[in-house]
Amino acid sequence: MPQVETAMGSIDVDDIGMCLMHEHIIIADWDMRQNYDDYVDVEKEVPKAVGSLNKAKERGVKTIVDLTPVNLGRDIRSIIAVSKASGVNVICPTGFYWTEEAWMHGWDANHLSTYMIRDITEGILDTNVKAAIIKCATDHTGVDEFNKKLLHSTAIAHRETGAPISTHTTVANSSARDQVAAFKEFGVDMSRVVIGHLGDSTNIDYLEEILSSGCFIGMDRFGLEAFLPTDERVQTVVTLCEKGYAGQMVVSHDACSFQDFFDGEYVEKFAPNWCYEHVPRDVLPALLAGGVSQADVDTMMVANPKKIFSAKGGY
């Protein structure tokens, strides 16, 4: 039986169960944290995250994938603490966000990939917890020269280790299309890639174009009503299931118990359902009511995550 690394050690892929494939626990910039002691109160935020995950756990969630990149504030010790206290498996990430960090400019893709490979093969810091998925991102700047270097480094680490790739995209510039093209150029097996945030789009032709590459797509921002209302997100998934694509979709929120992008009270006001329990509590019943079969729900929530983490070995 294939295994996958988590914050609590390796588990059989059969034990992943219902899985939210694109989430975050704590996002907080490390430069700020190291210079301002009160930037984030981890002792407060860890129990808060545990409480939020416990609500999802009560509704059947067994595993989440934390996709916080290294340079977006990945906090492996908090991830471990939250996983242990909640009993929810957390699959941990490596990889870099789309932002142009000054230190990156003097290094090529091969050098950047060495850090990801180390996280996957040796473990993160001194924790012995190994990353099991590679995060990368393309945003409003698109796949420019710098971003292509990041995608190339991701591809190198993926092909060396076999760890799957999960991405951040924006629908405003159709960056998913350019990510697919770049990964194909770098020899990536697209069946081992999740192209993220495509649930922000209702353009079925565009989604089918991305799906035709053989990748998975993330319908993974449920609860972000400001980007797209839940009913429209649900209908898009319903339509794609009717077209036979359940085997290539994963469903999640891109939620975060704490993030330094916004004031917490503001988030609760503009996105009250942007939380780990929204999918099992509200979205899955809505999909069933919309005509999606229980078998297709199980495929998206259980079988597809298992498949993503079952493919092993570099190539």
Tell what function each PLM region has.
Residues 2-9, 274-315:
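Mid-to-C-terminal alpha-helical segments outside catalytic/metal-binding sites
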